Amino acid sequence: FFQAEDGIRDVAVTGVQTCALPILELLKSVSFKSLVANCPHCFNTIKNEYPALGGDYEVIHHAELLTHLVKNGRLRPGFNYKGTVTYHDPCYLGRHNRIILEPRTVLAAIPGVTQVEMGRCREKGFCCGAGGARMWLEENIGKRVNMERTEEALGTGADIVSTACPFCMIMLDDAVKANGKGDEVSVMDISQVVEKSLG
């Protein structure tokens, strides 16, 4: 068992190195202070795996950047939005990197927004179904993961399901539409909700 696991790990490490090295070369060719990622998967890889390959950068997720801008008064959501938002914690943002309060802080800064939590949220959040390349898998047994998660989101009564991951957005949006709620409920990145609040 351990030999097989080590062999799989070796293949995975080789694959990461093959993909990462051209990106590391590109990053070395430009000058920057911080790298901002909107994808939690990319954020996690560059922040936590690239240092072992020689890529040690300050990496922040756009939820952290938006929180910083709101707290420092450089971003002032002003449009009074009357609506309810539930936030879906992406796995690689919430559970893996503990970025949990930041997206909620951004949403709380928008006048008129009422936040409601799903039953499984924050550190105990539930996957959208895209992880592990399941986004491209047609599940034949049981309920699709994105359908289960979206039903939980719809059960909150929110008119916006917000997240901070492009993969989660696709999975949740597909399931909202499959549930026949596409005209009633929007799926939006937190940055889109902020943009909407700017008038």
Q: What is the role of each PLM region?
A:
Residues 17-199:
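Iron-sulfur cluster-binding electron-transfer modules in prokaryotic oxidoreductases
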Residues 1-19:
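Single conserved hydrophobic/aromatic residue that forms the stacking wall/gate
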